[in-house]
């Protein structure tokens, strides 16, 4: 919004050219989202407390968690408010990637909000059924996947539509330009052509998978938000590189026109996340809830797809991957041993993985900070792929 205003008034006030610089707007988006979160945080927490949306705590989990019962949840709305305001203020609202990422983020946020609302307001411990939740996630994920298959491949919406119609006329069998290929880290001249169907399937699993992986990780005070901020910031760097014809050529990456604007969104997400951490750090005053976790995971997945860094997301989000695998392995092993031996057995003391470490004697803050450190190292490793190719 401010970019459009600056471009309109630029002839009358030359200092407004500052607003056209992507890096300046990214910094301001961070500050704006951070400020909104810090200022509005107490009001949001107070309103959530008045709504009596207290978090229910598992009685079979670590005993130290029982004191958290009643802490207001659904605090992810604070993050979404910061992201929305900062992105709309400092982003280029004519950029198609901004809108598709916002659509996925807030679409998944609505799903999470409904799930949380049913759990804590209607006192329905099931919330949305898994089938219902995955259905709506799939609707949003597939829509985004189809759009991005053609949007990543072309420079503007007119050419996106032309490419889509050409695909339809080809009997749904046409391939995609090279910039839509799956990029392999550390290999500068090797990529894997996905085709339209391969792109759609991969994108669907990345977006929906990332959303649910972040949601599973959200189990301790401050645990998930810092990895989200770190991974989001790293993806913002990739977006800046991919969106620049100069840097992308120098670093041997495909140039994706318009992708650089995602730096604004990632910066807003980082600022909003840090503001939320102010109130979510141990002992937490508010929990994120599904409204925040599903939204942020979907956002990370969508940005990673646009900048063609799906594999790098898998690396940088290693904590999310480990948490998800721990649940899958725990459930699978329990079912297998119950069928084989007549009683279910566990691989871990408790899943997701962070609870296993708690029950192994780690304090909650130790688990959280160590997971942060691991994520920081993984993000630095992921960023090294910019040059080590």
Swiss-Prot record:
Molecular function as annotated in GO: metal ion binding; phospho-N-acetylmuramoyl-pentapeptide-transferase activity; UDP-N-acetylmuramoyl-L-alanyl-D-glutamyl-meso-2,6-diaminopimelyl-D-alanyl-D-alanine:undecaprenyl-phosphate transferase activity
Protein origin, superkingdom: Bacteria
Pathway terms, separated by semicolons: Cell wall biogenesis; peptidoglycan biosynthesis
Membrane topology: Multi-pass membrane protein
Family annotation (InterPro entries): Glycosyl_transferase_4, PNAcMuramoyl-5peptid_Trfase, PNAcMuramoyl-5peptid_Trfase_CS
UniProt entry keywords in alphabetical sequence: Cell cycle, Cell division, Cell inner membrane, Cell membrane, Cell shape, Cell wall biogenesis/degradation, Magnesium, Membrane, Metal-binding, Peptidoglycan synthesis, Transferase, Transmembrane, Transmembrane helix
Major subcellular location class: membrane
PROSITE patterns documented for this protein: MRAY_1 (PS01347), MRAY_2 (PS01348)
General function of this protein: Catalyzes the initial step of the lipid cycle reactions in the biosynthesis of the cell wall peptidoglycan: transfers peptidoglycan precursor phospho-MurNAc-pentapeptide from UDP-MurNAc-pentapeptide onto the lipid carrier undecaprenyl phosphate, yielding undecaprenyl-pyrophosphoryl-MurNAc-pentapeptide, known as lipid I.
Annotated protein name in UniProt: Phospho-N-acetylmuramoyl-pentapeptide-transferase
Provenance organism: Burkholderia vietnamiensis (strain G4 / LMG 22486)
